[in-house]
A protein has these predicted regions:
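Mixed-charge, glycine-accented linear interaction segment located at domain edges/termini
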Residues: 124-158
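Terminal or standalone catalytic/regulatory effector modules within metabolic enzymes
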Residues: 2-127
Length: 158
């Protein structure tokens, strides 16, 4: 399933939630619909599907330390690419994959909130020349984060 846009409508429970400060400053006076139009998933050259990760390697009594292997299929325009990296988590893995395929984006801020049955992710990213906020949501927290990162990459690299 592509991470171009969310498959479900934005969670209405988020309307009452406080936005991260930087995004709140940029969107002062805007309706929730306007915030989503400006920062939600958009059409762009980058799409993501087929996300997989391996189990973490256990190191002693701290199983969360170490890297996992992540695999994804990236669609950049009409070009389909397979990517594979080892990283500490899914956002680190995706940003490394994006960099390797010409979408340099660094996550400056990351915020997640529960909104009913959905998780909403707000990311602030930069490619070194411009910075943008993006929003993604999904019933799975990892998928929500990946959607937000893809939306951010499409924005900063536009």
């Amino acid at each position: 399933m592509p991470y171009l846009a969310s498959t479900t409508p934005p969670p209405s429970t988020l309307v009452d939630a406080a936005l991260p400060r930087g995004l709140r400053d940029r969107t002062a006076g805007m309706s929730w619909e306007a915030v989503l139009a400006a920062h939600g998933p958009t059409v762009g050259p980058l799409r993501l599907s087929g996300w997989k990760s391996s189990e973490p390697r256990h190191q002693g009594r701290r199983p969360w330390l170490g890297h996992r292997k992540f695999q994804a299929t990236l669609a950049i325009g009409d070009l389909i690419c397979n990517a594979s990296v080892a990283a500490g988590g899914p956002v680190a893995a995706l940003t490394e994959m994006l960099y390797e395929h010409g979408f340099p984006v660094e996550m400056l801020e990351f915020h997640q909130r529960d909104a009913g049955t959905q998780t909403v992710t707000f990311v602030h990213g930069s490619n070194g020349l411009r910075d943008e906020w993006a929003v993604g949501w999904d019933s799975d927290a990892t998928q929500s984060a990946l959607r937000a990162v893809v939306a951010c990459a499409n924005r900063v690299c536009a």
